[in-house]
């Protein structure tokens, strides 16, 4: 039985990926500060208790576990910290991950973040993180993976950090599955008319796109149809106007994707409950992870941990 903890849990996408990959995994602790995300998390995980602010949590209150998982927010590391030669991570949420790793020493961890972390502050932020993880005793692997390489029609890239306490572990990130994707795979047959954008909004998007093109800037919206291979990245801002992912509709204005489509775009099953408003749902799925990517990484982690365990026998 593998025990995991789910930090910065959001709606539980990382946990879901681990549960799909492991038949013998149990989440023993979850932490999430956003009350609406907690509502969705609890609706899908039996209403279990979710700890609030991890910065206020005593490590003594966190159960022992085998795997720490976290989709932690990317916060700029202080210049002072960088000048100290990676000595200071305090004041960032990464520090809370670090203090739990140091206190609990789980066998492994999986951290997820935006791809931009790789180049943030000319790469120094990632160097700070890696240095601290290594000083905590972990052998660390990093990779940027794309959702569309794992059967999901979304152009979403994220960086993943996987670490093992046992340096004999031989871990490899999963390879692309080689499956063609199509936006039609996630579309509902009969979406509600309320998701069709108004004439005023559509005219505004087109005008802005023309202005941006004339100014040599990128276009202002993303238009897709069932045959498109993939969409743009769904972000937490999607609830504002939905312009990054619009779906063509014959004979009328394009529409936003629906919350169930947003869930599918992150690889959540149709059985996943969405007990919150559309605005909160878009924010939650935009903030979440691509579940099939997590599952693929978790399967590789399980294989690596099992191989080391078998060698000990």
UniProtKB/Swiss-Prot annotation:
Q: Which enzyme class, named as a word? A: transferase
User: From which domain of life does this come?
Assistant: Bacteria
* GO function terms (MF aspect): DNA (cytosine-5-)-methyltransferase activity; DNA binding
Question: What keywords are assigned to this protein?
Answer: DNA-binding, Methyltransferase, Restriction system, S-adenosyl-L-methionine, Transferase
Q: What is its EC number?
A: 2.1.1.37
Q: Which Pfam families match?
A: DNA_methylase
* Catalysed conversion reaction: a 2'-deoxycytidine in DNA + S-adenosyl-L-methionine = a 5-methyl-2'-deoxycytidine in DNA + S-adenosyl-L-homocysteine + H(+)
Per UniProt, residues of the SAM-dependent MTase C5-type domain are 2-308
Active site per the UniProt annotation = 74
Family to which the UniProt record says this protein belongs: Belongs to the class I-like SAM-binding methyltransferase superfamily. C5-methyltransferase family.
Q: What is the protein name given in its UniProt record?
A: Type II methyltransferase M.NlaX
Which gene holds the coding sequence for this protein? nlaXM
